[in-house]
Amino acid sequence: MTLEVIGAGFGRTGTLSLKYALEMLGYQKCYHMMELRNHPDHQGLWQAAHRGDAVDWPALFSGYTATVDWPSCNLWQALSAAYPDAKIILSLRDPEKWYDSVMNTIYASSKARFDSDEPANQAAGQWAMEIIWNRVFDGRMDDRQHVIEV
């Protein structure tokens, strides 16, 4: 099994609907951020990939034929090089509405986990901060214009 579809769109641009649509269209399984609940061991692999370390993509995506959302959308170019026959899908949303949605949902959740007293929540929040918010948006999530420009 190999990746046939790679999503390049950020979370909150319809990626969950896209995941379900791809699966309805016959793509075996579509990797999405929520897959990390079932594969907590993947967190370290994604950290390595985002550092630029070599990653065994076929092992990471074993059983999947598509991927959308974070953490893979950050690496769509590397994935495209590893899977040159895969189709790239870019999901988009009005930037202002997207920013508001992110800040009120997934960023707020990541921040709450990061600030939690519970070690497991802290670890999940730290991972999201490192992989998404700090790496992609330079840790400047409160700077609306900067985030939208990214």
List each model region and its residues.
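Anion-recognition interface
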Residues: 6-13, 17-149
